[in-house]
Amino acid sequence: YNRLCIKPRDWIDECDSNEGGERAYFRNGKGGCDSFWICPEDHTGADYYSSYRDCFNACI
């Protein structure tokens, strides 16, 4: 099945960024807005990607 690229709910700070029609989210407490996306894994936690497109390509 297709895994969605999502933000981890417990780390979130939103910045004014929008890539490919999707909102980017950012890790709290990292200083500035370094974007990341996660691709959830059932058994291994999550893979992290710096752009929505990279995440999308890996998840689908």
Swiss-Prot record:
Disulfide bond keyword on record: yes
Domain BPTI/Kunitz inhibitor per the UniProt entry, residue ranges: 5-59
Matches recorded under SUPFAM superfamilies: BPTI-like (SSF57362)
Protein name: Tick anticoagulant peptide
Record keywords, A-Z: Disulfide bond, Protease inhibitor, Serine protease inhibitor
Source organism superkingdom: Eukaryota
Keyword Transmembrane: no
Role this protein plays: TAP is a slow, tight-binding inhibitor of blood coagulation, specific for factor Xa.
